[in-house]
Amino acid sequence: MTGPRYTPLVASLPAAVPFVGPETQERALGKQFRCRLGANESVFGPSPKVIAAMANAACETWMYGDPENYELRNSIAKHEGVAPENVIVGEGIDGLLGYLVRMCTSAGEAIVTSDGAYPTFNYHVAGFEGNLHKVAYREDAEDPAALLDKAQKTGAK
């Protein structure tokens, strides 16, 4: 056999990408976007203070970062008024959603979400064999009552 030997679950997943990045879309179009709002990027770029902080920290980039993100987690916790153990730092929303699904979902378990919500969440649920139930938007918005009703009917936690 050549190539990786995927588990049956991974082999059964569609070859679809839940989020196509703007760079991929730009290459397909053959031109750059004038505005990248879909990627949740600031049209203003980083603040001068952020640029200065990155420049000041550049000489430390030869070291691995603190895997516990101790200073960052403690700073966020202090700002938000929570304990540091209640703060999770990740590589972005895609990774954090993956952690959430791994920590809280068992195979076959009912998961309820809005139809049209963040697609990577659905991708992670499928990847961990959750049973996804979608609820339509009502008047272009989340429908909390319908979400709660679906959760109660499906036994989602």
Q: Each predicted region: which residue ranges?
A:
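Conserved core of the PLP fold type I
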Residues: W62-K157
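N-terminal "arm"/small-domain region of PLP-dependent enzymes with the aminotransferase-like
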Residues: M1-M63, T154
